Structures are given as structure tokens and as C-alpha cells.
């Protein structure tokens, strides 16, 4: 039986290696031809003129990921705390399946919800303040991604909080701490590794999300810090143009995938380092 387990593990490793080989073998030549600095810091993406700069899409990906974290992390963490320590059993029986259902909803359905509900709401509210915007924007994508990462953060954080020995809570209460104080000063810090894991997983999903973002972000590759302006992320750029790209254009899109892969790798390595430091 151990041979079967070994083969399964080897298959997983082989899949990762093959993906890395494909990305770097096809992406690095494009970076060399375009110029790494020009590729990473170029402000214009015009395949028709052989101009390939992905800085706008890098920044746009960071903007909507940061926005999703600002929206999703507080809500997700507080919901996890409520479900672990405050929620009545009957309400928990309803709330838990709902959060699990959120995780199973396809991205395209989230995108449709954002396009029909979130985008018009932003357009309407902006109009009240005299702003003429389409609604497809950084803000719309951030709100939608904030909702999409909730089940990941809630599920992992709740499991981490429930894994903390009850003796921690009982000891804090015995020393005179109130219920809220025992939770936020004892239980939550004890579960910080698991909570951080949930946040990192949520960030990973946000930065790599494609279909939902395409439907609400506006898909305009440009440099902007305006939350009400349309943007294009790295994954969206790959999906929108890969179908007809050839030659250097295709290789530049694969190189964009390399940059996205490195982003995810940095996030995971950062989490690993932080986890080791906290365990030391």
C-alpha cells in the first residue's frame, strides 16, 4: 500500500514541476526579448505595437487584493469568532452550511452577482455625489473578492479557534477575565497561526481570481489609483488575450503567468517564515 501512497505523492510533485517547467521555459524567453525591466515596469500594453508592459496590471492586481483583504478579513475573522464562541446551536446549524455553500458557488455566478448588483449600486451611489462612472471598477472588484474569500477565512479561522484547548479559556476566566477579553487576548492569539493561514489562502484566491474580476473590473490596462476607475488584472489579461495571441504576444502572456506564479510563491513563503518564527 505504501507504494500507492508514494506514487500519488510523486504525481503531485511531478505536476508542480511540469507546470513550473512550462511557465519558465515559455515565459523567460519573452522577458529576455522584451527586457525584464521594460516588461515589469512598462506602463503600456499594446500587443499590436509589440509593447508589453505589465506594471498597470501588477498594481491593479495588488489594489483589488488589498481591497478584498480590507473588506474580507475583518468580516471573516469576526464571523469565525462568533461561530466558535457566541453562536447558538440552532443558528450555527443554519450559518455553517451557508458559509460552506459560499465556497461552492462558481466564480461565474459571483461575477454575475457583481455585474447585476454591485456595479449598478456603485454607479448609482457615485451619481448621487455627481460622479459619472460606469461602476465597473477597483471598488467593485474589491467588494466582490472580499465576499468570495469569506468562506476560506471563516472556515480555516473557526477550525483554528476551536482547536485551542478549552483550558486556555478556563484559565483566563479563572483569573478574572471577562468572556470577550478571554477570547481576544487568549484564544485568538493562541490560534494566530491557523488564522494567518486562512488569511493567506484568501489572499491567494483573491490575487488569482479571474472570471468574476473580468465581469466587474472594467478590463482597462492602465495606471490609476482611483477606486472608481476600471482596471485589468494579470489573470484577466491572460484569459482575455490568450485565445488569439501568437508569437511574442503569447509568450508575453505566459511571462505574465510567471510573474503571477512568483507572487503566489512569495505569499506562501512569507506565511511559512512567519509561522516558523511564531513557533520558535
Residue positions per predicted region:
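Cytoplasmic-entry segments and transmembrane alpha-helices of multi-pass inner-membrane transporters
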Residues: 2, 75-114
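Interfacial/capping segments of alpha-helical transmembrane domains
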Residues: 17-41, 228
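Membrane-interfacial helix termini and adjacent extracytoplasmic/periplasmic loops
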Residues: 33-52, 111-147, 218
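Transmembrane alpha-helix signature in integral membrane proteins
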Residues: 54-82
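Transmembrane alpha-helices
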Residues: 97, 101, 156-157, 161, ...
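Glycine/proline-centered hinge or cleavage motifs at structural transition points of membrane proteins
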Residues: 106, 175-176, 189
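C-terminal transmembrane helix and the adjacent membrane-cytosol boundary/short C-terminal tail
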Residues: 158-162, 166, 173, 243-280
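Interhelical loop and adjacent transmembrane-helix boundary motif
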Residues: 213-261
Amino acid at each position: 500500500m505504501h507504494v500507492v501512497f508514494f506514487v500519488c505523492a510523486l504525481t503531485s510533485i511531478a505536476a508542480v514541476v511540469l507546470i513550473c517547467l512550462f511557465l519558465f521555459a515559455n515565459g523567460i524567453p519573452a522577458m529576455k526579448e522584451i527586457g525584464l525591466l521594460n516588461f515589469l515596469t512598462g506602463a503600456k500594453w499594446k500587443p499590436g505595437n509589440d509593447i508589453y508592459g505589465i506594471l498597470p496590471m501588477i498594481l491593479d492586481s495588488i489594489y483589488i487584493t488589498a481591497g478584498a483583504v480590507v473588506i474580507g478579513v475583518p468580516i471573516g475573522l469576526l464571523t469565525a469568532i462568533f461561530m466558535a464562541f457566541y453562536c447558538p446551536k440552532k443558528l450555527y446549524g443554519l450559518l455553517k452550511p451557508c458559509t460552506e455553500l459560499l465556497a461552492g458557488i462558481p466564480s461565474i455566478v459571483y461575477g454575475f452577482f457583481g455585474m447585476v448588483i454591485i456595479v449598478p449600486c456603485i454607479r448609482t451611489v457615485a451619481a448621487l455625489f455627481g460622479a459619472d462612472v460606469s461602476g465597473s471598477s477597483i471598488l467593485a472588484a474589491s467588494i466582490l473578492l472580499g465576499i468570495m474569500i469569506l468562506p476560506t477565512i471563516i472556515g480555516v479561522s473557526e477550525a483554528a479557534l476551536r482547536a485551542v484547548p478549552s483550558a486556555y479559556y478556563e484559565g483566563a476566566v479563572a483569573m478574572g477575565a471577562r468572556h470577550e477579553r478571554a477570547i481576544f487576548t487568549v484564544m485568538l492569539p493562541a490560534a494566530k497561526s491557523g488564522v494567518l493561514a486562512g488569511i493567506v489562502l484568501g489572499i491567494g484566491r483573491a490575487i488569482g481570481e479571474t472570471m468574476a474580476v473580468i465581469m466587474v473590473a472594467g478590463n482597462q490596462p492602465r495606471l490609476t489609483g482611483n477606486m472608481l476607475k476600471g482596471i485589468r488584472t494579470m489573470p484577466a489579461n491572460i484569459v482575455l488575450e490568450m485565445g488569439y495571441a501568437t508569437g511574442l504576444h503569447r509568450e508575453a502572456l505566459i511571462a505574465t503567468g510567471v510573474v503571477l506564479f512568483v507572487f503566489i510563491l512569495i505569499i506562501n513563503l512569507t506565511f511559512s517564515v512567519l509561522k516558523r518564527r511564531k513557533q520558535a
